[in-house]
Amino acid sequence: MKLLFFTGSRSEWGYIRPILQICKNKKIKYEICATNMHLLDSFGNSLKEIEKDGFKVKEKIYMALDGYNNFTMTKSLFILGSSFTDLIYRSKPDWIILAGDRGESLVASIVAAYTNTPIAHIQAGELSGNIDGQARHAIGKFAHIHFASNPDAYKRLIKLGEEKFRIKLVGAPQLDDLKSNKRIFNNLTSIKQKYNLENLDKKDYLLVVYHPVTEEFRKTR
């Protein structure tokens, strides 16, 4: 059996990395396809992070057009669709592994479905509240196995009409990654010094995570 892991940005790599590590440890055959933001210098060229984590990226699909607005983004997705079809024809994976709610993952799910390639979807059934949420649920309609991270997502998938035997309540893989990631915890001292947080353990604090709204990219600063 061969698994093909598909990833388009740093944001979903944390979902995929711990699963890939299990595949690596158990000698399960897999390939990685990296596309979109992973290959762009303007977004940090996060392909290097994948390679730094010890994984070889066999397939790269350059899809992004200059300009980065709604129209170039949409046209880029169709470029991806054509290239990913060729990849599946060459690679012939037994399963496609997708994560999250990004547009490129939606395109990959459509291609996989129409080439009769089974799809497993990580963190299916969650709510994003914008077009990303629509993409997530659309991916779910093409997927054959749904990995839910929490009971609410599990119940939502059932309400969306998915068969119970296809839904697995497994938790969020990035939390496993965070818990076992020695690089993060070994660097806590330097992180506290850099951001003047030496006394963090002695007081209450609130951690705020910012996530831009896809439809409002012009307002993002």
Label the model's feature ranges.
Residues G133, T220-R221:
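Charged helix-capping and loop-helix junction motifs
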